[in-house]
A protein has these predicted regions:
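Sec/Tat-exported extracytoplasmic proteins
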Residues: 40-47, 52, 56-63, 75-86, ...
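A non-catalytic alpha/beta surface segment that caps or lines the substrate-entry region
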Residues: 50, 54-167
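Bacterial N-terminal signal peptides
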Residues: 8-17
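Alpha-helical metal-binding/catalytic segments enriched in His/Glu/Asp
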Residues: 166, 180-234, 394
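Second-shell loop/turn segments in exported
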Residues: 34-43, 56-69, 150-155, 185-197, ...
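Structural recognition of the beta-strand scaffold that forms the well-ordered cores
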Residues: 48-56, 86-88, 163-167, 177-181, ...
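His/Asp/Glu-rich mid-to-C-terminal helical/loop segments that flank catalytic regions of hydrolases
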Residues: 358-408
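Metal-dependent peptidase/peptidase-like ectodomains
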Residues: 226-339, 345-349, 356
Length: 408
């Protein structure tokens, strides 16, 4: 039965592409469409790095601080400079009481115990290999760089929050939309360069390319930079709560203007740079990106729209084969703890990232995660290139699904 659901979802997805995009899929499905490749080629490693570096001027961009608000303003100014008109979501945030059971999934059992069943990570996956403890650094003195430490000194306070998005309106189907997201906030007393400066910069670079004056799309694309991810996906959840019931409404009637087009898919980008493999037996990490590094594409098998989300994930995988220059992609079914989660029962949703979120990142495979070492200077061009390959993958997939092309 599940296979029938998946194939039905695939058929629905293909049907949604329109004749222009379907026609480009021949017997050799990995052959790129030259119109799409021309857009992908507008991505540039140095520009991607410059955007990440620009985000790090605001330290860890912790929500509820002046540095976070300044980062939102900076992101909005960049999006406007690309020609992508912006809007903001506004909501209130109050710190919830501490969770008395922060790890209900259990995690790994102690080495000396005999569990009744294999342990599972967040999202439902089974952790394997060498694991190290993870945590969120809250000690300012753990940051040895006085400049970065000073940037991050202001504590967070509860109250009003804002996040920014911009929109590329489609020409023939402005009433249908893909949402491309990343979270711009961080914590840990570093620069949040990877988590999630790398995803934020990726989304901004896609906004730059698609907002080119010579680029048009059939369908609408929204580029959203969520806030309050680190406190529980609050910014993305606020967007869903405020906007999901507005989908497809033409306002004013007869205008062909759709403030919230019908959602066709939501694609999140979170931590794009670091795939150095599992920790070594002594708990240290390899200094270089592993030769087998890949872009991870995850959907959640328990979501109400899991069949459609799986189809979307494989569309991203195919785009990676067509347009990514260096690193392949891998599809998994344990998407979790990321801003696509509030969307997953409303619209097909996937997450694009460096490692599997639950089984690998959650097992300590990225030692910079929420730590003072998440600095721009920590990463090298091999790391940044993994992020660029994720950008190539997403830009190629979005371009195909929205009928994007360069006007002649």
């Amino acid at each position: 039965m599940r296979s029938k659901v998946v194939w039905a979802a695939l058929a629905t997805l293909v049907a949604s592409l329109g004749p222009q995009v379907v026609a480009q899929r021949g017997a050799t499905a990995s052959v790129p469409d030259e119109r799409v490749k021309a857009l992908v080629d507008r991505l540039d490693l140095e520009r991607y790095k410059v955007t990440i570096k620009g985000l790090t001027q605001f330290g860890d961009r912790r929500q509820g601080t002046d540095r976070n608000r300044a980062a939102v303003d900076w992101i909005e100014a960049q999006l406007k400079s690309y020609g992508c008109p912006t809007e903001r979501i506004r909501y209130e945030f109050k710190t919830p009481p501490p969770n008395p059971n922060p790890n209900p999934a259990g995690g790994a059992a102690g080495r000396g115990s005999v569990p009744e069943a294999p342990p599972t990570s967040a999202g439902g996956g089974r952790p394997r290999g060498i694991r190290t403890r993870t945590s969120v650094n809250t000690d300012p003195n753990a940051q040895p760089d006085a400049r970065v430490r000073a940037l991050n000194m202001q504590p967070a306070t509860d109250g009003p929050r804002e996040e920014v998005y911009c929109t590329k309106v489609g020409t023939t189907r402005p009433d249908e939309m893909y949402i491309i997201g990343a979270h711009m906030d961080g914590h840990g007393w570093g620069e949040a360069a990877n988590d999630d400066g790398s995803g934020t910069a990726l989304v901004m670079e896609l906004a730059r390319v698609f907002s080119g004056s010579d680029v048009e799309t059939d369908r609408t694309i929204r580029f959203a930079l969520w806030n309050n991810e680190e406190t529980g996906l609050n910014g993305a959840a606020a967007y869903v709560a405020q906007r999901k019931d507005l989908q497809g409404r033409e306002n004013p009637p007869g205008s062909r203007r759709f403030p919230e087009p019908k959602w066709l898919g939501m694609i999140q980008h979170d931590m794009m740079l670091f795939d150095h493999g599992m920790p070594l037996p002594d708990g240290t990490m390899r200094k270089e990106q592993r030769l087998e590094a890949d872009v991870n594409i995850e959907f959640q098998s328990t979501a109400k729209l899991s069949g459609e989300a799986q189809a979307l994930a494989w569309a991203w995988h195919k785009a990676n084969e067509r347009y990514a220059t260096d690193y392949p992609a891998k599809v998994g079914n344990h998407m979790t703890n990321t801003d696509s989660t509030p969307f997953m029962d409303v619209v097909p949703s996937i997450s694009v990232r460096e490692n599997e979120r639950g089984t690998e990142v959650g097992s300590g495979w990225d030692p910079q995660w929420h730590q003072p070492t998440d600095l721009y200077s920590t990463y090298n061009d091999q790391d940044f290139r993994l992020g660029l390959n994720a950008a190539q993958t997403s830009l190629g997939a979005v371009a195909e699904l929205t009928g994007a092309r360069i006007k002649r």
